[in-house]
Amino acid sequence: MEVRLADCAGFCFGVKRAVDTVYEQLKNGKTIYTYGPIVHNEEVVRELAEKGVRVLESKEELKNLKAGETIPTVIIRAHGVAEEIYDIMEANGLECIDATCPFVKKIHRIVEQKSTEGYHVIVVGDPKHPEVEGIVGWCQGPVTVLETPEQAENFVKTEGEKLCIVSQTTYNYNKFQYIVEIFEKKGYNDSVVNTICNATEERQRSAKTIAADADVMIVIGGKHSSNSRKLYEICQRECEHTYFIQTLDDLHLDLPKAVRLVGITAGASTPNKLIEEVQNYVRINF
């Protein structure tokens, strides 16, 4: 039996950069907070909590954090935040370490500029995802979040209105293209910017390729990880026996007979050591 790992699995550039930033700041002996969990992976967050890193879960908690004898350090995670969050930190005298993914920062600049120029911004993505909430928070005018093709079909723009369409970096690439086609048929393609991260596209393509050939597919990722859930959806369409796990303890394989290939992929917030644990476990026990 072969165990094959997808080419693009585990920490992406932005997540690794954010996690490394937290560990670097810990070396300085500071009081460290992250605005929201640094990554959507409970194991990583738990390890950092054991080292004293605290998580600010809401804007209200951030507002209540003020500089005293010491100046708290707040790290912005890779998902990025709305412009308002920076203003709160500055007003409260907090030290801000910005670990926003550069690809997300680029979207902030695009929507800020386009909305200032009078465009109605369309963000394709999950309205409850922190990255999308951050993007919306940089728009200076009308903004609409669309998550499904059905919502795109039902969207009607105001006559004479210009649209700028962007995407959550981890959105399903094929679904984004389909939504863009819907807008093009309506004549709503004034400004379309594919802001899906290249690593996300490659991760999804790689997972789909392996899943199409695999008898069993394992997707490793946090239960709150948007990109991990999308990987699971993609793999499940290609491979009937697809498992979505957060840790090795979640893995209860019921393998079909005559398994040739077990494929493994992982979300952008999944640490390499966890991927290796799952790989080794499958190789040894099956």
Segments from the language model and where they lie:
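The feature marks the mature, well-folded catalytic cores of soluble enzymes
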Residues: 1-286
